[in-house]
Amino acid sequence: MTRHYEEAEGLCENIDKETQSYIFNQTMMRIKDPKVSLDFYTRIIGMKLYRKIDFSDMQFTLFFLAMPGDVDDNNAPEDSNKRTTWTFSQRAMLELTHNWGTEHDEGFKHHNGNSEPQGFGHIGFSVPDVYAASKRFEKLGVKFVKKPDDGKMKG
């Protein structure tokens, strides 16, 4: 019997015991302006900032966010050093990386992966009703790249 739910070339059937305690901790995205990005992820999406780490010698900041129900929110330590360790033990964190000064550079742009050459596509959030969520996003001023029924993929 296979350990996978689907078949595809390249799947490994044997689990290396050394990976048993691995967790998927984070996806990292580079951002231009933390004020804009943090507003979107906390006000519009409802995420919570769990850890902010400044690297002044290298001039960048990391922001670790998550949906409160996706992490062990009740046990997040108050102490920032302990919360760093806690952050790296959680599941489904979003890491936003801001390189200082990019927010003031009008010509600066990160490649979004959707224009050529394509690469990264998106991160996804499940919502109870995609149309109701989209209406809420519009009321809150979110600019859509593609609405739920635009393009080939619907809903």
Give the location of each predicted region.
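Active-site/binding-pocket entry motifs
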Residues: 70-71, 99-103
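Short Gly/Pro-enriched turn/cap motifs at secondary-structure boundaries
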Residues: 85, 114-115
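Vicinal oxygen chelate
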Residues: 1-20, 26-29, 53, 108, ...
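A short beta-loop-beta micro-motif enriched in histidine and acidic residues
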Residues: 119
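Core segments of cupin and vicinal oxygen chelate
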Residues: 18-22, 29-93, 132, 139, ...
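A periodicity- and composition-biased signal for non-globular, repetitive helical segments
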Residues: 36, 104-105
